[in-house]
């Protein structure tokens, strides 16, 4: 009997998994990928690079399918074969064998291919949900960082405006002290007198001390 093929894209299209969970309506993972491509971000962590190198150098025990199409009975999904190599918990429920359909094959930890496909679909759905949650957290973190930068910039500009306002007020106060228009150089007062607030209008009414 031919082995059924697994369509991963159909699983993410709104089909509920065994746990009854559905992917979120907003595709945060796609938004994160688009933002990553727009900003041209690349992962340069040593752990990720080492993992990528080991993955590329790893030799798979199963041969890859040829380029030309083969019959459905000879073609087996590579994702299922790769996933079957990983340790997985034994399934809780057993496949019903009394429905008249004998098991097509026996995998390690599974009674039938259908049971393995159901477990694989559940694992894929959980992985997609985790990816969506991580993408949503990263997008929210970027939004929070952007808001903090805006707040810091606004605070800096506010302090600059306050400093400029205080400086203008000081200049206005000083201009009030030296409001008289300058006459000829011979009739103008000296700079020290101006600093202590002496003008031509109040020089006769002010009292001075030599102490």
UniProtKB/Swiss-Prot annotation:
Similarity annotation: Belongs to the FAM167 (SEC) family.
InterPro entries: FAM167, FAM167_domain
Coiled coil feature spans: 120-153
Pfam families: FAM167 (PF11652)
Keywords: Coiled coil
Source species of the chain: Bos taurus (Bovine)
Keyword Oxidoreductase: no
Metal-binding in keyword set: no
UniProt superkingdom: Eukaryota
Region (Disordered): 1-30, 56-108
Protein name: Protein FAM167A
